[in-house]
Design a protein with these regions (language model features):
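Long, hydrophobic/aromatic-enriched structural stretches that serve as scaffold segments
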Residues: 50-99
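N-terminal "assembly arms/tails" that initiate or stabilize quaternary assembly
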Residues: 1-69, 228-244
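Sequence/fold signature of self-assembling virion shell proteins
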Residues: 40, 187-266
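Structural beta-strand/beta-sheet cores of well-ordered domains, especially the beta-sheet scaffolds
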Residues: 81, 170-172, 241-243
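Alpha-helical scaffold segments that mediate packing/assembly in large oligomeric complexes
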Residues: 88-158
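Short, catalytically relevant binding-site loops at active-site mouths
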Residues: 126-130, 138, 179-183, 214, ...
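Extended, solvent-exposed, turn-rich assembly/linker loops in the middle of proteins
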Residues: 133-197
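Long, hydrophobic, amphipathic alpha-helical segments used as structural scaffolds
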Residues: 34, 38, 116-123, 164-167, ...
Length: 266
């Protein structure tokens, strides 16, 4: 099933390779969840839901009653953003070897990546999807102002200790709001050691800048990003001026251990 409709596009395969490369590079620069969580799949466009946990009886049956075995399932969202490619500029590239501007494709890929990050960190509560920051059962520690070097270190150590005491021994990843992340590029007094390098020695699964409001420490085994369709670009048609394209993917966060996540609150 060619849901990307590429066979209908009036341009050669190497242009698709250029488009794909631009989209993947733009999205990859923003994606953090995939870098510290396991990634499973892609399993294909038809993956619309995944099951969580084990099958079990929904209630204990009476002696003369049939039992009902059931599991819980969550939906797999499809993310999509439209974009355009100028027919004239593509012709100029093919005929005259002028540079091919793929900024709209890159912008669309970035929009899809930002939405993926939102699903990973915040979920979609009205559709029963948990995120790392708001899943029921996650751990929390109190933090102080990250403008203070000691406060930042103390907060991360407290979060790691909470996870370790709960049986989650790492490796750990640390995801930070932009301001918190940028504050780590400071030297400890009388040393050449940047704080970010110090924290990377504690959070060996990586320290990442993400579009979130609170720091979070995540054990590697907290869950996985499950892919239906990985990021691709498809063809929707032409109006004679632009080729209508779209960037799409389908994914969901599967949280196996909510208690393997520790959020640092203000």
């Amino acid at each position: 099933m060619d849901h990307l409709n590429r066979a209908q596009a009036p341009f050669p395969a190497f242009i698709w390779e250029r488009i794909d490369a631009a989209a993947v590079a733009a999205a990859s620069a923003l994606l953090t969840g995939r870098r510290f969580l396991e990634v499973e799949g892609p399993f294909g466009l038809g993956l619309t839901a995944i099951e969580l946990g084990a099958d079990d009886y929904c209630r204990v049956p009476d002696a003369n009653e049939a039992g009902a075995v059931i599991s819980r399932a969550i939906s797999v969202p499809m993310l999509r953003k439209s974009c355009r490619l100028s027919a004239r500029r593509l012709a100029a590239h093919l005929d005259n070897d002028t540079p091919l501007n793929l900024a709209e494709v890159e912008n669309a890929a970035e929009a899809v990546a930002r939405r993926e990050e939102e699903f990973i960190y915040l979920g979609q509560a009205d559709f029963g999807l948990d995120g790392l920051l708001n899943a029921s059962g996650h751990r929390e520690v109190k933090g102080a102002a990250w403008s203070n070097l000691d406060a930042a270190l103390d907060a991360v150590l407290a979060a790691i200790t909470r996870l370790d005491e709960g049986g989650f021994h790492g490796p750990y990843a640390l995801a930070l709001p932009p301001a918190h992340y940028n504050n780590l590029f400071r030297h400890y007094e009388h040393t050449d050691l940047l704080q970010i390098e110090h924290l990377k020695s504690l959070c060996t699964h990586g320290v990442y800048k993400a579009a979130i409001d609170m720091p979070v420490v995540v054990d590697k085994h907290a869950g996985a990003v499950v892919l239906g369709q990985d990021l691709h670009v498809g063809y929707a048609g032409s109006d004679g001026i632009h080729y209508q394209l779209f960037v799409c993917e389908s994914m969901v966060l599967r949280l196996d251990e909510q208690e393997a996540v520790c959020v640092v609150t203000d």
